[in-house]
Every structure is written in C-alpha cells, then in structure tokens.
Amino acid sequence: DKNASRLNLSIVRVVCDGRSLHKVLAPTSFDAILLDVPCSATGVMRRTPDVKIIRRKSDINKFAALQSELLQSVWALLKPGGRLLYATCSVLPQENDAIVGSFLSTENTAHCMILPQKVGESTAYGQQVFPSVLGGDGLYYSLLGKPFL
C-alpha cells in the first residue's frame, strides 16, 4: 500500500497480508505462483547504498521468518502439478537456500524442479545471481513443484 502510494499507482488493490491469502482465496487456485518476497535487499546495494546503513543483523532473522510464513501460506494456493518460483533480491543464504531447504524438509508435497535455463551459480536448491560488474543486481530464485495427487 505504501509503495503504491509512493509510486502514484492507482491500479493496486491490497486485499490482505500475503500470509493470510490462504484464508481469502480458495485452495489450489493457481497453476503457477511467483513469490517475490520482501528481503534485506543485499543484492541491490549497488543501486541503493542506503541498505548498508539501514539494515541491522536482526532484520535478517525477521525477513527470514516472514519469508517462511509467506512460502507456507501461498503453497496451499498452488494446484497439484503447479509451479512456484521463490525469488529474493538478497545474496544471503539465510533468505534463500535456508528458507527453501527448511520448507522442503517440512512440506512433503514440494520438490525442487530442474530449471530449463539457469542464470547465476547453482546452489543446493536454486540459483544465486551476484551483483555484476556489468551493472546487474543480485538475486536468488528457486523453482518448486507440487506433484499431481
């Protein structure tokens, strides 16, 4: 809501906190989900150097908890046979592989999918793109699949 106002966007409608989407939308509503979670923004420090000043170590744990809750919440909205792309603009493993790995260890209907095209360095559960000398941002992504029942 704040970002929509800041960007002067009138087409954005906030329905609820993403952690409550499973309460508002029907289960298995989506074939695919892009979950671009709030994060520390450590991958975009090149463009937003204030991140170095405003971020605290304790913020990372708060973001990680929120990321886990969001992933758990939206998983119920994914149809069997569906795919979920988990993404951050972070280069920190605590917000990336640690979140996906923890989720996979507790959610027996989830598995990592092989990405058809890979950009960045392979990690245990996804791909990490580091900020580039060519001017690109850092980011992480992992493709998760839900098998047909």
Where do the PLM segments sit?
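S-adenosylmethionine
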Residues: 1-149
